[in-house]
């Protein structure tokens, strides 16, 4: 059964089942089908000979999901554009993508875009006037046609449009549902903005299994009282987020099985899952399964996964990121271009149907990052890692490795050991430059419970523990204490903001 057919069957079997909830707004599977059909019919009638991608603008409104499906039913890839994205970047996305149309479930604050804008009111008119009309199923996105395009940061300052095809998404969704043992009708957390591909991990596995997406927005996350009130009402069974977001939630004592009694599965992606975070989750949610996954946007969300058990936690201080999905494979490439043997570090290269067809309108960038290996698409991730007995271990970004006073080191390794210290709830390492070279390491720490009256005594205690785990040259010179670690709208640590704060 095709992906869209899998979603639409719930409009027949359970039409009144809620597909998506955001604050007081919700849509059923029946409404999702009717409105996305109406929109697809309108798009096809307005743009009969055009297949350019369509920008979908908003935050967590139910119209976002309707618009996504309406686009692909009409044969167009969609480009999710979150409200938090700066106007200049939205402008560059519009220009790079060649989009002619922007659908919005909210007010569009960006001006002078080179696209036709369909407002929230326009959309309601379309849903009403085209109700009951169905698009030609032959027009729907299929095969190696783009299903969605997500723009990620580019080293040149220009965003890169990662093209994910229908086949890429089908491969990911099938694997996620089967390997993570997702069941029919579950409630999925939707924490990541739609412009971040982690959101795909909950959207499509939920929709194909007749589940309910429970969306929480950035304003809720900024107000913990609202956040936990929403979570308490949700009855979430499948939790999808970055580890940083879960770590933030764990600072609330009531975040446990009593708040979410039916929690079945935690799915983590987008960042390293610290051992101590997984350990706390097992303590708070003893009946739930914790899955650690890995994958860049260019390989459709995730390509590896592992069930994190007590045994795994005790065996590995730095958690492995899992075994590769069966239709893909991993290669570890050495600097000379040869394949590294088991246990030897190198660059992680992903091969198989999960791999994107490249960056939209950027052939030079595509050629640099993508290649063909044995007739299959391959992506050079820029991530360091190694494989041992089929199990992938992630060792950070190759560009997260810094050289300090002649020593090469991984910032994430230092963060791992720092978080394991007593009196530390959360921590990020910020390398501070002097001129063109790194001068010292600053540790930004969210302290746990302690009885030290002075910060320097707390610092001494933490440093004493670090000295037992790390060589002296990896010990941060300075410590700064904060009540929380800033996060990006995507739920990752906002390293740029931290750097600007500490160097101001």
From Swiss-Prot:
Ligand binding (ATP): 152-153, 292-297, 383, 394-397, 492
Name of the featured protein: D-alanine--D-alanyl carrier protein ligase
Signal sequence residues: none
NCBIfam families found in the cross-reference section: AA-adenyl-dom, D-ala-DACP-lig, PRK04813.1
Xref: InterPro entries: AA_adenyl_dom (IPR010071), AMP-bd_C (IPR025110), AMP-bd_C_sf (IPR045851), AMP-binding_CS (IPR020845), AMP-dep_synth/lig_dom (IPR000873), ANL_N_sf (IPR042099), DltA (IPR010072), DltA-like (IPR044507)
Family to which this protein belongs: Belongs to the ATP-dependent AMP-binding enzyme family. DltA subfamily.
Molecular function as annotated in GO: ATP binding; D-alanine [D-alanyl carrier protein] ligase activity
Binding site for D-alanine: 197, 301, 492
Keywords: ATP-binding, Cytoplasm, Ligase, Nucleotide-binding
Gene Ontology CC terms: cytoplasm
Protein's cellular compartments: Cytoplasm
EC number: 6.2.1.54
PANTHER family given in the database record: ENZYME, PUTATIVE (JCVI)-RELATED (PTHR45398:SF1), PTHR45398
Pathway: Cell wall biogenesis; lipoteichoic acid biosynthesis
Catalytic activity: holo-[D-alanyl-carrier protein] + D-alanine + ATP = D-alanyl-[D-alanyl-carrier protein] + AMP + diphosphate
GO biological process: lipoteichoic acid biosynthetic process
Function of the molecule: Catalyzes the first step in the D-alanylation of lipoteichoic acid (LTA), the activation of D-alanine and its transfer onto the D-alanyl carrier protein (Dcp) DltC. In an ATP-dependent two-step reaction, forms a high energy D-alanyl-AMP intermediate, followed by transfer of the D-alanyl residue as a thiol ester to the phosphopantheinyl prosthetic group of the Dcp. D-alanylation of LTA plays an important role in modulating the properties of the cell wall in Gram-positive bacteria, influencing the net charge of the cell wall.
Cross-referenced Pfam families: AMP-binding, AMP-binding_C
Superkingdom to which the source organism belongs: Bacteria
CDD domains assigned to the protein according to its UniProt record, in alphabetical order: DltA
